[in-house]
Regions:
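Active-site acidic/histidine clusters and adjacent loop/turn architecture
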Residues: 232-300
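Active-site-adjacent loop/helix surface patches within enzyme catalytic domains
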Residues: 287-327
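Catalytic cores and adjacent binding grooves of peptidoglycan-active enzymes
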Residues: 309, 316-370
Length: 370
C-alpha cells in the first residue's frame, strides 16, 4: 500500500545502502557516501514551489539538504597563470561548458579537501577531459561569460577525474555561480545517518506538484543512458556557438563543414547528420527493413517535423540550457507523434542508440547515439 502511495508522484528518489553497520574503522567523517541519501530531481530544474516544499519537509524531519545547480556557460578565452592568452574564440562565438554549482557550506561532504578548499576560495574545479581539451592547468584562468555579458576570469583550483565531478566539466560555489547566471537547481540531496519510510511520507505529504514520481531507484544500469557533454565532445568534436533567435544557435563553420554531411539512408531518404552516425543509423534501418518493420516508421512525420542535425538548445531550457545532441547531429527524431513499437526501440538500442522514452522527461520520438 505504501509503495503504491509513493509511486503516485513524479520526483526521482534514490536511496543509497545503509552503511550504519559497517566497520567503524572504515568510516570517514563528513563524507556523503557514509550516509543514506535521497536525491530529488525533475525534468529540467526544480520548481521554486517544489524547492520550498522540500525545505519544509527537511525542516520537519530535522535533517540535511543541499541543492545542486547547473547551466551551460560561455567560455570566451583561457589564459595561462602568467596572463598570457592561451585559447581564444571567433567573433561573437563562444565555447560552452557544463558547470555545476554547490553550496560552500557542504562542499566537504562531496569532494576531497583540496578540491573543497578551491571551491570555497572562488576557484573552479575542472574535469580531466576538460583540462586536456582546453590545455588547462592549476593556476590558469577560464574567462567565462556572466550576467550582462561580463567576462569573469576564474582561476583553476584543481583538476579531478570526470567521474568524481559527476561528469560535469566544472564545478564552482553557489555565489560564483550566481555571477555566472546559474540560478536553476537541478537536484536536491537529502542525507541522514538512517533514512526510513517517515522521510518519504513527509515528502509525499508536502510536495503538492502532481506530475511527480516517487520511486526507490535501485543501482541498475539504465540501457537508455546517454553520454555526458565531456564525452560527446571527446567522441564527436567540440565547437564554438553563436546565439540566434530563441533556442537556435549557429555552430562553428569549420567543425560543421568537417562533420555534418548529407547521405541517403534506407527508409528515410536524404538525411543530414554527423558523419559518425552513418554506420549505426544505416545498420538499424536495414535491420528494420529485414524484419519487415518499416511501416512503423512514419515517413510523413519524419519529413514534416523530424530530423537529425538541428543546432539548438534543449527546448525546455532558456539561455544557459544544455546544447541539444541534435546540434552535434548525433540524435534523430522520426515518429514525432506516433511512437515506436518495442522491437524498433530494441533494434536502435542494439545499434548503439539510447531511446528518450524512458527518461525523466520522456522524449519518445528521440534516438541518440553514444
Amino acid at each position: 500500500m505504501l509503495y503504491a502511495l509513493l509511486t503516485s508522484m513524479i520526483l526521482n528518489f534514490s536511496i543509497s545502502p545503509d552503511m550504519s553497520h559497517e566497520n567503524e574503522n572504515h568510516y570517514t567523517k563528513n563524507k556523503i557516501d557514509n550516509y543514506d541519501i535521497i536525491t530529488i530531481s525533475q525534468s529540467g530544474s526544480l520548481f521554486y514551489s517544489v524547492t520550498n516544499q522540500i525545505l519544509e519537509s527537511v525542516n520537519n524531519l530535522n535533517t540535511n539538504v543541499t541543492f545542486i545547480g547547473r547551466a551551460n556557460v560561455g567560455l570566451e578565452s583561457t589564459t595561462f597563470a602568467n596572463n598570457e592568452i592561451n585559447l581564444t574564440t571567433l567573433d561573437n562565438f563562444l565555447y560552452n561548458l557544463s558547470i555545476k554549482t554547490i553550496e560552500s557550506s557542504v562542499v566537504d561532504y562531496f569532494y576531497d579537501e583540496e578540491s573543497a578548499q578551491a571551491i570555497r576560495d572562488n576557484k573552479i574545479v575542472i574535469s580531466e577531459l576538460t583540462a586536456s581539451r582546453y590545455e588547462l592547468n592549476v593556476g590558469d584562468y577560464v574567462n567565462l561569460v556572466g550576467l550582462n555579458s561580463e567576462i569573469i576570469p576564474i582561476e583553476v583550483g584543481k583538476v579531478i577525474k570526470d567521474s568524481k565531478i559527476g561528469w560535469f566539466e566544472g564545478v564552482v560555489n553557489k555565489e560564483l555561480g550566481f555571477k555566472l547566471g546559474i540560478y536553476r537547481n537541478i537536484q536536491a540531496i537529502i542525507w541522514d545517518s538512517h533514512i526510513n519510510e517517515n522521510f518519504l511520507i513527509e515528502l509525499h505529504k508536502n510536495i503538492n506538484y502532481r506530475k511527480v514520481k516517487l520511486t526507490f531507484r535501485e543501482n541498475r544500469v539504465n540501457k537508455n543512458w546517454v553520454l555526458p557533454t565531456a564525452l560527446v565532445k571527446e567522441m564527436f568534436g567540440d565547437f564554438q556557438i553563436k546565439e540566434r533567435d530563441g533556442v537556435w544557435i549557429t555552430t562553428e563553420p569549420e567543425w560543421r563543414e568537417e562533420n555534418i554531411q548529407n547521405k541517403r539512408m534506407p527508409i528515410l531518404g536524404i538525411t543530414r547528420c554527423h558523419r559518425l552516425m552513418w554506420e549505426p543509423l544505416e545498420g538499424a534501418l536495414n535491420q528494420i527493413l529485414e524484419e519487415g518493420l518499416e511501416e512503423y516508421l512514419i515517413i510523413e512525420e519524419w519529413k514534416s517535423s523530424g530530423g537529425c542535425y538541428a543546432p539548438r538548445r534543449i527546448n525546455r531550457f532558456e539561455a544557459g540550457g544544455s546544447i541539444s545532441r541534435h546540434a552535434w547531429g548525433i540524435a534523430i527524431d522520426i515518429n514525432t507523434k506516433s511512437g515506436y513499437p518495442p522491437r524498433v526501440v530494441e533494434i536502435f538500442n542494439d545499434w548503439g542508440f539510447a531511446w528518450g522514452g524512458t527518461w525523466t522527461s520522456p522524449d519518445e520520438m528521440h534516438f541518440e547515439l553514444r
